[in-house]
Structure formats: C-alpha cells, structure tokens
C-alpha cells in the first residue's frame, strides 16, 4: 500500500522536491483509481521531473521500463527490459560518484516485489534481496552473476573507473553508467514465471505459449510494469475493465486492488482468466480456433467489441462473416483494417512471439 500512498501525494511532494514523510497520512484508494486523477498526477510528475532534469530528460516508468528516482529526484535507475540495458544517472552536484555507486548496488540487488518499491517518489525504499530480481540477467566484469553485496559493490567500483560518462544538457551535467544485460535476459525473466503460467494455463484452459507471448508483448516480463492507461503488472491488467470483468465472473465484488495486480501470481491469473473469457464468452461465436485466437489476441489489446466491428456493427453478423473467412484472411483483416494501429501491430507481435514459445 506504501506505493499508492505516495502516488496520492505526488503533487505536493514534487513541488518541494524532498523526500516524503508518509506517517499519519490517510490513503484514499478510490480517488487514485480514478483515471483522470491518475493522468493529472502523471502529468504533474513529468512536469516536475522536467524542471529538475531539464528539457528532453523526462524519464518515467512504463510497461517495459523500470525507472526509480532517489536523492530528491537527482539520481535515477532505468532498466530498459526491451533493449536489455541498465542506465544509472545522477545530476547531483556533490559526490556524483557516490550517488551512482549506491544506485548501482541497489539496482543490481533489488528484489522482485513491485509492492515494495515506490516508483512515484524519491524514497530510497529499495531493499537488498537475497534473491535479486536481476540475478542471472547481468554479470560482472569477471563473468560472474551478482547475488551478494560485496560483488555488486566491487562491480560498481569497476564501472565507475571504466564506464563513467558525462554530458551537459544546457541545464545540468548528467553523470551516467550503462550496463548491458546478458543476451538471453528475456528468457531468464520468462523462466521465473513458468510455474505460475503453467498453473494458470491448466486452470483456465489457455495455451501456455499464448500467455507467455502476451506477457512478452505487454511487459517484456517486467513485474514493475505500469502504463499511462494505468495498466499494471506482467500482463498489464486494467482494474476497471479486464480486472472488473474477471472479478465479476468469479463472483467477487468490486475491482482487484493495485497491490493485488502487482503480485505476479495474481496478475498472471487475472490476465489468463480474461483471455479465457474472451475465448469462451465474448468471442465464442467464432468457430475456427485459429480465427478465434487471432480475435482474442487483438481483443486483449483493444476490446472484443472493436474486433467484431471491424467486420460488422452487428455482433452476430460479425461472427458469421468471420466464420465464412479463412483464418489467414481474418489475420490479414485484423492487421490491416482494425482502426487502432496499436491493435494491428499487437496481433503481429503476439502471434510472432507465440510461435517462438511453441518451438521451445
């Protein structure tokens, strides 16, 4: 719950640009759930980061980007899970090497619990974990994986001696160090969640390869994934749409909480349950399983209604039209005629990723 308390306090927190004091403050989750409120807060967050870091230097957490600010927003760690890079930067005028060293160590040794780290404040709440999330995804200059603090500290010292860079953006001098993840970092992260994926697959009758493909496309297996649409976690579940539908189908009232969806097992379960709903309820009128899979994939991104409207404004007629088409033609139609460019690309990405998981 700590994360969402800070989210509700972003505006005053950033105006003062100081560490937050959360004691004695009440958290109104219902207010934070409001999408407009979330958008306003994110806009304020971005504006204040720009004031501190300078124009074109705004960097925020996203589906495939972990971004954590510390030191009164003067130091940040960025993991780009798509590119496979860790970039640690600071604009601190005093002891920039020390700030970078601490950020490198904490980033390399952080755990995998998104509820334990506040991405929306400068609170240094990153706990050193006995099972670091990045263990096996990054190696030091000797080729060894990094689990212990002494090894992370030694590697940080090496990086400061050999890879420290600086640039002047006209407002600040930015000191940075970039670390590459191992080439198969994506597979390393996917492996962490295979047990959860298999359990959800058996529970809901959804192919493991499809679940993994959705996770790769949505978050690149980043458990800290957030988005401008307030989608959360590995499968980027939105509380008030997919989350609400799944809870209702399971006889639960209300919406899944943010902390619930940031738990990897819950997120995978909810996302997979929604895939099953799309397949067995919303798009059940599509007979061919391959055509229905294409529709389900596209609907996971843009909704079942938008998929059917590509073919007809009448849902029954849309299903009949799809049933009269070959699967390849359905794929071609969805990737060329869907009104959302994102949804058109989404089907291509997920379908391509699913093929790779079927071969493994």
Swiss-Prot record:
InterPro entries linked to this entry: Lysozyme-like_dom_sf, Murein_transglycosylaseC, Murein_transglycosylaseC_N, Transglyc_AS, Transglycosylase_SLT_dom_1
| Residue numbers with lipid attached (S-diacylglycerol cysteine) | 17
* Locations listed in the record: Cell outer membrane
Query: Which GO terms of the molecular function aspect are on file?
Result: hydrolase activity, acting on glycosyl bonds; peptidoglycan lytic transglycosylase activity
Question: How does this chain sit within the bilayer?
Answer: Lipid-anchor
Swiss-Prot/TrEMBL catalytic activity: Exolytic cleavage of the (1->4)-beta-glycosidic linkage between N-acetylmuramic acid (MurNAc) and N-acetylglucosamine (GlcNAc) residues in peptidoglycan, from either the reducing or the non-reducing ends of the peptidoglycan chains, with concomitant formation of a 1,6-anhydrobond in the MurNAc residue
- Using the UniProt record, name the top-level EC class of this enzyme in a single word: lyase
Q: Supply one GO BP term.
A: cell wall macromolecule catabolic process
Lipid tethering residues (N-palmitoyl cysteine): 17
Where is it mainly found? membrane
Q: Which Pfam families match?
A: Mltc_N (PF11873), SLT (PF01464)
Q: Which residues form the signal peptide?
A: 1-16
Q: Which UniProt keywords apply?
A: Cell outer membrane, Cell wall biogenesis/degradation, Lipoprotein, Lyase, Membrane, Palmitate, Signal
Is Coiled coil among this UniProt entry's keywords? no
Enzyme Commission number(s) from the entry: 4.2.2.n1
A cellular component term from Gene Ontology for this protein is: cell outer membrane
Functionally, this protein is described as follows: Murein-degrading enzyme. May play a role in recycling of muropeptides during cell elongation and/or cell division.
What the entry lists under PANTHER family is as follows: MEMBRANE-BOUND LYTIC MUREIN TRANSGLYCOSYLASE C, SOLUBLE LYTIC MUREIN TRANSGLYCOSYLASE-RELATED
Provide the family line.
Answer: Belongs to the transglycosylase Slt family.
Q: What protein does this entry describe?
A: Membrane-bound lytic murein transglycosylase C
Tell me which species this is from. Klebsiella pneumoniae (strain 342)
Q: What is the lineage of its organism?
A: Bacteria, Pseudomonadati, Pseudomonadota, Gammaproteobacteria, Enterobacterales
């Amino acid at each position: 719950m700590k994360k969402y308390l800070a989210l509700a306090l972003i505006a005053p927190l950033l105006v003062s640009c100081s560490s937050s004091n959360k004691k004695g403050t009440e958290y109104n989750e219902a207010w934070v759930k409001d999408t407009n409120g979330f958008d306003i807060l994110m806009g304020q967050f971005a504006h204040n980061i720009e004031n501190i870091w300078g124009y074109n230097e705004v960097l925020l957490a996203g589906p495939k980007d972990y971004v954590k600010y510390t030191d009164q927003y003067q130091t940040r760690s960025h993991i780009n899970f798509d590119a496979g890079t860790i970039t640690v930067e600071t604009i601190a005028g005093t002891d920039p090497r020390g700030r970078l060293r601490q950020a490198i160590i904490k980033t390399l040794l952080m755990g995998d619990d998104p509820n334990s780290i506040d991405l929306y404040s400068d609170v240094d709440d990153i706990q050193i974990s006995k099972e670091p999330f990045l263990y096996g995804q990054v190696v030091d200059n000797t080729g060894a994986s990094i689990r212990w603090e002494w090894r992370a500290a030694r590697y940080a010292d090496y990086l400061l001696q050999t890879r420290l860079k600086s640039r002047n953006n006209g407002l600040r001098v930015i000191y940075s160090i970039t670390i590459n993840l191992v080439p198969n970092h994506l597979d390393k992260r996917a492996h962490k969640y295979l047990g959860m994926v298999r359990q959800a697959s058996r529970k809901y009758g959804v192919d493991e390869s499809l679940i993994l493909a959705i996770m790769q496309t949505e978050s690149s297996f980043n458990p800290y994934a957030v988005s401008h649409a307030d989608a959360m976690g590995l499968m980027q579940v939105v509380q008030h749409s997919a989350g609400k539908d799944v809870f209702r189908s399971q006889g639960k009232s209300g919406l899944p909480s943010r902390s619930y969806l940031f738990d990897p097992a819950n997120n995978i379960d909810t996302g997979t349950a929604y895939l099953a709903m799309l397949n067995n309820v919303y798009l059940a009128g599509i007979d061919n399983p391959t055509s229905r899979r294409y529709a389900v994939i596209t609907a996971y991104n843009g909704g079942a209604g938008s998929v059917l409207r590509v073919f007809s404004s009448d849902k029954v007629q849309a299903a009949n039209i799809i049933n009269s088409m070959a699967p390849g033609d359905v794929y071609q139609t969805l990737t060329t005629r869907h009104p959302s460019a994102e949804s058109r690309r989404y089907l291509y990405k997920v379908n391509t990723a699913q093929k790779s998981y079927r071969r493994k």
